């Protein structure tokens, strides 16, 4: 993975000090032999776990290394959960089995003495096993580090497992299952013992759960290890292969693993529930505890705001927990992990179990504030959570409305639960006004907060065009041309085909014009084909996605934004901070930052509801072309550049945003919630809200990445009960009216969902 940082190894320092009481829920089993150079990093990675309800059994297999006794005694004194057992040298397999036999917990976590684990591994694995009681073990994807550096992410396949070990040795396993198949020492030390044991389990029809995150860090020593020594000895390697083949032949039936992310294997009608949890608080310090619910970690304006917001929070005062609700790659996750603990719910839980896990997080962390932003699931789970934690403030931040989706998208969802939110933040004044006038939102608790830009980073005097190799290579060719920047995700709402037609119009008047396209997305290939069709090959350069776009702002003369829907784009802030005028569609709050002194605002003709129609009017194309020409040919161009940066410095910096949000968070966490205090009595209704969300959101989650396809069929309705009784409930009537207003009810009726939900409610009321 291009952006994965192998230097961010877990356990490089000790960060936590929780020492809970009670029986351990997980027993960690480690065989130790001559490993004093690595064991402390392993220990730190265990001590740093967000789930402290473990014991660690270290079996010293007669180590001869000088200093062994001292370092193991140091470990035992470090924490009462650590137990060192000394034995005569009998080999690592016997030592590991003895560590398993000493386990007090029903679940055993196998970890070698030189490997390390992500700080959330044990917590994720425990709840994966808890919510999949028929599974035998759970494991995560692997990071190989030290001697070699690469990522190991393989989907489980029973037939492939017979030929190649797809499974890491590190896993959370049912203790009894290990004992039932004879443990690790059933084979000799020259056989791949973990692979052999997995095959024995598969032979019995036992199956694993693969969690979809990089949780296990496997140390590949530069001097090699046991497996390397076997591979370098032909006779030993042959023996190992023969034993594996012999065991593989005993497997007569196919075994299928559960592999996240997925939306199958659960009832879409399932009610939210809570775990039976009575353990002490996980966080033992006096800090306030913040919970953030985001959809994902991706490269975009909303995610950059989330990142900037978290970076402003004083971690001496606050603990941070981040939950995400949509599958995504690891692109930014590592960046967010430095702020606190991160849980991608799609990577280790079924949707039916998400509410219970979030409830557990709030209870085990004593959460003081919940901050939701742009997660659909977040909006639907908040009412239910509020019914359990009425005194906890819930707030949300919204970036834009979208009239082409769900009658307004996130602002509409926020409006629907406004009575349960202590505060709503919007990225523009325009959005606050839209929520009030178009959605009927009472805006007394709505506060516009501009996302801002770091004016010290986006400063053209500190940026060189040569900093980007691709740009450096072609810049001289286009140096004397009029250069327009089109920097965004190449997707339908950004209207890339319109951008091409605007370029075509400009080139028909002045061929000395070029468009620099920076970004990627689902419509990139379409854009390239259309550019070729329009004969624009000499007037367009595709640079793809870039982590650092500053050189492109400096290289270009003006930025073009022709989107059909935006809030106030991050690229607008960045371009203007870099002294570049912007020509933008009159969408969202763009005109709050752009005026004729530093750019142009263009009124769109196309409506959001017509998003997928790419037959753009000549009048709209002419509007953009005219605005761009006015700037590119302006005698006041240099003055416009200066005005752009002055506008940023006058209230649109990231420092201003951080100052406002720091004050807001401090105030919210110092006081209990003032709204929704009666929400516990509406818990049943809020449960139905979540059921409805699941029903309307059935879909396939990336089957090529481990998810299993969903047929999308709704369950057959059986009866309809107590409709009149439901309607007599004023809270239910308000709920139904909200669904009707948003258009959700219409979709639900079409699918037959509304009848089934009312039946479920009636059954429970009865």
Roles of regions detected by a PLM:
Residues 120-151:
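Conserved donor NDP-sugar-binding/catalytic core segment of glycosyltransferases
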Residues 581-584, 594, 601:
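Short hydrophobic beta-strand element within catalytic cores of glycosyltransferases
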Residues 87-103:
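Glycine-rich, basic loop-to-helix element that forms the pyrophosphate-binding segment
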Residues 1-4, 671-766:
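Boundary detector for helix-to-coil junctions that initiate low-complexity/charged tails
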Residues 1-45, 276-283:
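N-proximal low-complexity "stem/linker" segments adjacent to membrane-targeting elements
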Residues 37, 303-308, 482, 486-505, ...:
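A conserved mid-protein helix/loop that constitutes part of the nucleotide-sugar donor-binding site
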């Amino acid at each position: 993975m291009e952006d994965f940082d192998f230097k961010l190894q877990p356990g490089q320092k000790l960060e936590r000090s929780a020492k809970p009481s009670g029986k351990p829920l997980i027993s960690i089993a480690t065989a130790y032999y001559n490993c004093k150079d690595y064991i402390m990093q392993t220990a730190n990675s265990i001590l740093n776990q967000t789930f402290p309800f473990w014991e660690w059994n270290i079996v010293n297999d007669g180590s001869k290394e000088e200093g062994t006794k001292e370092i193991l005694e140091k470990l035992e004194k470090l924490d009462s959960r650590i137990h060192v057992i000394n034995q005569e040298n009998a080999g690592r397999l016997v030592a590991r089995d003895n560590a398993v036999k000493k386990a007090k917990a029903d679940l055993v976590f196998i970890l070698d003495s030189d490997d390390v684990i992500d700080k959330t591994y044990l917590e994720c694995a425990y709840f994966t096993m808890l919510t999949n009681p028929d599974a035998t073990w759970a494991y995560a994807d692997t990071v190989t580090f030290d001697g070699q550096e690469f990522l190991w992410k393989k989907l489980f396949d029973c037939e492939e497992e017979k030929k190649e070990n797809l499974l890491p040795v590190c896993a959370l396993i049912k203790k009894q299952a290990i004992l039932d198949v004879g443990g690790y020492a059933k084979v000799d030390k020259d056989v791949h013992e973990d692979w052999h044991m997995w095959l024995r389990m598969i032979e019995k029809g036992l199956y694993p759960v693969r969690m979809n995150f990089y949780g296990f860090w496997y140390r590949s020593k530069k001097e090699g290890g046991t497996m390397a020594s076997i591979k370098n000895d032909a006779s030993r390697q042959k023996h190992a292969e023969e034993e594996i083949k012999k065991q593989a032949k005993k497997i007569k039936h196919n075994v299928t693993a559960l592999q996240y992310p997925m939306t199958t294997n659960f009832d879409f009608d399932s009610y939210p529930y809570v775990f039976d949890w009575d353990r002490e608080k996980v966080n033992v310090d006096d800090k306030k505890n913040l919970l953030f619910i985001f959809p994902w970690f991706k490269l975009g304006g909303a995610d950059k705001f989330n990142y900037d917001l978290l970076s402003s929070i004083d971690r001496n005062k606050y603990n941070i927990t981040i939950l995400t609700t949509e599958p995504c790659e690891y692109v930014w996750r590592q960046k967010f992990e430095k702020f606190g603990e991160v849980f991608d719910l799609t990577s280790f839980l079924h949707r039916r179990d998400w509410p219970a896990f979030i409830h557990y997080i709030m209870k085990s962390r004593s959460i003081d504030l919940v901050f939701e932003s742009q997660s659909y699931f977040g909006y639907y789970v908040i009412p239910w959570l509020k019914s359990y934690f009425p005194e906890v403030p819930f707030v949300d931040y919204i970036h834009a409305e979208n009239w082409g989706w769900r009658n307004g998208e996130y602002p509409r969802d926020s409006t629907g639960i406004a009575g349960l939110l202590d505060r709503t933040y919007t990225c523009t004044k325009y959005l606050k006004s839209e929520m009030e006038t178009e959605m009927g939102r009472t805006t007394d608790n709505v506060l516009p907060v501009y996302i801002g830009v770091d004016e010290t980073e986006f400063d053209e005097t500190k940026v060189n065009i040569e900093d980007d190799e691709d740009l450096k290579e072609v810049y001289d060719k286009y140096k004397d041309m009029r250069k327009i920047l089109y920097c965004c995700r190449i997707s339908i709402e950004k209207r890339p085909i319109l951008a091409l037609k605007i370029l075509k119009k400009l080139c028909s008047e002045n061929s000395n014009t070029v468009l620099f396209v920076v970004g990627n997305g689902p419509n990139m290939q379409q854009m390239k084909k259309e550019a070729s069709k329009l004969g624009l090959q000499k007037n367009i350069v595709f640079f793809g996605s870039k982590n650092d776009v500053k050189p492109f702002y400096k290289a270009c003369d003006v930025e073009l934004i022709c989107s059909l829907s935006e809030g106030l784009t991050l690229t607008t802030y960045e371009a203007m901070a870099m002294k570049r005028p912007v020509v933008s569609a009159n969408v969202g709050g763009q005109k709050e930052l752009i005026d004729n002194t530093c750019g142009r605002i263009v009124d769109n003709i196309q409506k959001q509801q017509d998003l997928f129609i790419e037959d753009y009017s000549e009048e709209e194309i002419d509007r953009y072309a005219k605005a761009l020409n006015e700037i590119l040919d302006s005698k006041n161009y240099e003055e416009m550049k200066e005005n752009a940066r002055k506008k940023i410095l006058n209230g649109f910096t990231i420092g201003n945003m951080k100052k406002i949000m720091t004050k807001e968070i401090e105030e919210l966490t110092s006081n209990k919630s003032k709204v929704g205090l009666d929400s516990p009595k509406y818990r049943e209704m809020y449960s139905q809200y979540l059921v409805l969300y699941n029903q309307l959101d059935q879909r396939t989650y990336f089957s090529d990445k481990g998810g299993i396809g969903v047929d999308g069929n709704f369950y057959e309705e059986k009866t309809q009960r107590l409709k009149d009784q439901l309607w007599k409930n004023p809270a239910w009537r308000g709920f139904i009216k909200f669904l009707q207003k948003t258009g959700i009810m219409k979709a639900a009726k079409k699918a037959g969902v509304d009848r089934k939900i009312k039946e479920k409610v009636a059954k429970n009321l009865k």
